[in-house]
Amino acid sequence: MYAFARKLLFSLDPETAHELSLDCLGAAERLQLLKPFVATPVSDPVEVMGLRFPNAVGLAAGLDKNADYFNALGQLGFGSVEVGTVTPLPQPGNPQPRLFRLIEEEGIINRMGFNNKGVAHLVAAVARRRYRGVLGINIGKNKATPEEQALSDYEKCMDAVYESADYIAINISSPNTPGLRNLQFGENLSHLLQGIKRRQALLHEATGKRVPIAVKIAPDMTDDEIKGVADALVSNQYEAVIATNTTVSRDEVPHSPHKEEMGGLSGRPVAEKSTHVIRVLAEHMQGAMPIIGVGGIMTGADAEEKIRAGASLVQLYSGFIYRGPALVSEAASAVAALS
């Protein structure tokens, strides 16, 4: 069935197809039409960050930026759904076109630029939660916010989403917000990580709820840079690291007509880079912090490879676009078979 839907969707502009598919999915969920078409979710409970995940396969941030569709997406068998990236204020993102399919390479290039309706909208949407799995909320800074004031944006988002989230993901690795990736290094990183942890402690005290925090990192770092980020996360007692975001490299797509497009590349072309980062993190941290593996998971075997490299959980995005809901159960079954 998805093969037919994909043929239709891939005949449309990528962003139009994205919006149409989510609108249809949301309508089907509201009318209670999804269940007959969805396989029984794979049950393979795993505890990570102090949370019990129904299975190890989650939906990565970026698909449901405003939490308008997470209840429907949650019915497709995911053990977790991560919504966002959301910023304090609404922003339109970058000019269109800003989303490109690399069909032969099973990749996607996006330069969306954190287009979202703002954190107030997201919190109102999450208040209508019916999804029973783990809900992550991915937060970022507004484009207009200077790097030196980035912490303030993350704090504003944390204040807003803290009581609604099962975990919070800190996005400092999108290539589509100018200067954002600079937050991954040196004093910028130390200042941000310490400030976010202070805010977490204050919110924990105020609410009585402990919400774990994961940090999402880029694949375009040297091994030494990866280890430096890992050391900073461990020393500041973060609960998890998400590896990885999209890549700015085009080494894996030398013949694509879209290779010159600016933006982050995801899907199969980033798989090897992502797995390498996971392996470096796992070998360096020696179990000090769980790793959530994301990047180029197109088959169950790809999910298994991420787990074998050192990830405790995995997330899908581009693979879900190319393969549809069948990939969720395929990946979850492959990971469950490792137990």
Curated annotation (Swiss-Prot):
CDD domains: DHOD_2_like. The keyword Phosphoprotein does not apply. GO terms for molecular function: dihydroorotate dehydrogenase (quinone) activity. Its EC number is 1.3.5.2. It catalyses: (S)-dihydroorotate + a quinone = orotate + a quinol. Binds 1 FMN per subunit. Monomer. Catalyzes the conversion of dihydroorotate to orotate with quinone as electron acceptor. This is Dihydroorotate dehydrogenase (quinone). It comes from Teredinibacter turnerae (strain ATCC 39867 / T7901). The gene is pyrD.
